[in-house]
Regions:
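Amphipathic repeat-derived elements
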Residues: 1, 6-7, 208, 214-217, ...
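Glycine-rich beta-alpha loop elements in corrinoid/cobalamin-binding modules
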Residues: 2-190, 196-200
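N-terminal pre-triad scaffold of radical SAM enzymes
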Residues: 225-233
Length: 233
């Protein structure tokens, strides 16, 4: 039943998908790969409210219902899967979540700045989305133009053949994620290139205050009225 995906109608700019403040698979399964008995973030702690890999599932559904509407991923699940990554649950290397899901863009890390800039550029059709810091996107490898200073990771196919190449990739990702001035990261997969733009600098104190002083209700969704959500308690 896909009616819930249509209740809000077609968005003016894009669909934004983030499964929550904790990796959905860690939240759903134990380290022994058994289904958890409860979920701290769902009404009445039900453990069956979300599918496996919800970013992928939700994106694929939205692309079927609204194929011409962009989908932007964000949150922990997408951030940790922006390039080739080891999936504990399937015990294998998986491609970028952009490939697996079919999403158009991915915002990684804390998204206060990139999401505001993304909306500004969606509203101004003259501006490119692909130069926004702290986003990742896919393009055809034949159309990709490298830049000086780019870090080219081993391709997904190379990582499948040699685990040391995946380890080398992971080192680059970790180093660039923690630099004040980072490099752009690229990786080839299935004739496409994943491009990960360097992040914004850390927010200033004033920027943090502005973000957290917005008029959030800090309440559960009204749909869950009368139901207990453990994390909110």
């Amino acid at each position: 039943d896909l009616r819930d995906f249509k209740k809000l109608g077609r968005p003016r700019l894009f669909f934004g998908i983030s499964p929550g403040c904790m990796d959905s698979m860690v939240n759903k399964y134990t380290a022994n790969k058994r289904l958890r008995s409860d979920d701290a973030y769902t009404p009445d702690a039900r453990p069956d409210m979300r599918p496996d890999y919800p970013s992928i599932v939700y994106t694929q559904i939205l692309k079927k219902l609204y194929p011409d509407v962009p989908v932007v991923l964000g949150g922990i699940e997408a951030s940790m899967r922006r390039v080739t990554h080891y999936d504990y649950w399937q015990d294998k290397l998986m491609k970028s979540i952009l490939v697996e899901s079919g999403a158009d863009l991915l915002i990684y890390g804390m998204g206060e700045k990139p999401v505001v800039e993304l909306i500004r550029r969606f509203n101004d059709k003259r501006l490119s989305l692909n130069t926004i810091p702290q986003i990742a996107y896919l393009c055809k490898t034949t159309d990709f133009i490298s830049e000086e200073g780019d870090i080219r990771l081993f391709s997904h196919a190379e990582c499948l053949k040699d685990k040391k190449k995946q380890a080398a990739n992971f080192r680059h990702i970790e180093e660039e994620s923690n630099k004040y001035t980072a490099s752009r990261i690229t990786q080839e997969v299935d004739g496409m290139t994943v491009v990960v733009n360097p992040p914004y600098p850390p927010l200033t104190e004033a920027e943090l205050d502005h973000s957290y002083d917005l008029p959030y209700t800090r309440l559960p969704h009204p749909k869950y009225k009368g139901k207990r959500i453990p994390a909110y308690d």
